[in-house]
């Protein structure tokens, strides 16, 4: 590129159209020209975009309290677990920001997290909300689909592929992401004697996960490994990827009881039984996880354990109404789009919560219960001109009686609603 002399005639900026005598400089490329003013403008645009891309990661790491506040907007209850997660995630990303030349040569190691709690207690939602809070790529994997390399199922590298896809194949962003592996308790060792049979979905998967949990440069096939064996591999360093492992660990309370029972020999035989299940989980130790079937090397790479409580009726009612994206708010908005008001009675909210507990689905089952109650309404209302309000009652949930429907003047339309 070069500056044209002043004796050149009729040279104009290809972008703004100004003549060369109207600007300070005119620079030429291959058949095109650009003036100094357009160069400055383009430079500003590029700088703004670069700054925006930088902010897509986090420029200022939120404090544990700020992380906790954000979690509180979306996740009801589980205060201890949220506090543990907020501190752990803050320390993890503070460690990443600190990486580089170190005067005291103290190396901060990664601490992955285990979430232990029943189905529907909020494990996945916590992990998702953390990733959203920090604006980092996030991927979910199911441990039950994983097998050792060479067996039918997913390789552990497929977990990394999902994170890379979530980062739009930006490896730098993916290397600072979060991966949530659900149902990690399902890869517990099936037998104390591993020589009896090959445990390809248990201890074998734990062994395969060890390296990526700790930190390694993994080779990831961009289209999945087994169907496209000749594809070029993507290299990704897992050292700074935070792994959150979730599982219900059904029966681990009995493991803890046995350990506590050994310590109370000589006391009343029911001494250990005074602990309820949630109090027992507070007593969990690495040796309990080992007795459950996790190998010591695997446990060592997940040093932080947070326990989630079983949600009671009051907690489930709050989940239905309080979070920013609460289900009641979602369905209310859905019917608003058809100019229909939706209302849930207090008794209906209690009935929904009680049914979720009966089904042992926790918060995860709330949506399906509401869908069952509203399916006919959502089918009929868009073509009904005289319905302006729908009220979900306790009978709607427990007795499958249709909701109360009201017209614009507040008159009850379906007076025969109580006839089953």
Swiss-Prot record:
InterPro entries hit by this protein: AAA+_ATPase (IPR003593), ATP-dep_Clp_protease_ClpX (IPR050052), ATPase_AAA_core (IPR003959), Clp_ATPase_C (IPR019489), Clp_protease_ATP-bd_su_ClpX (IPR004487), ClpX_bact (IPR046425), P-loop_NTPase (IPR027417), Znf_CppX_C4 (IPR010603)
One Gene Ontology biological process: proteolysis involved in protein catabolic process
Role according to the record: ATP-dependent specificity component of the Clp protease. It directs the protease to specific substrates. Can perform chaperone functions in the absence of ClpP.
Native organism taxonomy: Bacteria, Bacillati, Bacillota, Bacilli, Bacillales
Pfam families listed in its UniProt record: AAA_2, ClpB_D2-small, zf-C4_ClpX
Molecular function GO terms recorded: ATP binding; ATP hydrolysis activity; ATP-dependent protein folding chaperone; protein dimerization activity; unfolded protein binding; zinc ion binding
Family recorded in the similarity comment: Belongs to the ClpX chaperone family.
Residues reported in the UniProt entry to bind Zn(2+): 13, 16, 35, 38
Protein's name in the database: ATP-dependent Clp protease ATP-binding subunit ClpX
Transmembrane domains' residue ranges: none
GO cellular component, as recorded: HslUV protease complex
Residue span(s) of domain ClpX-type ZB: 1-54
Residues reported to bind ATP: 118-125
Keywords annotated in UniProt: ATP-binding, Chaperone, Metal-binding, Nucleotide-binding, Zinc
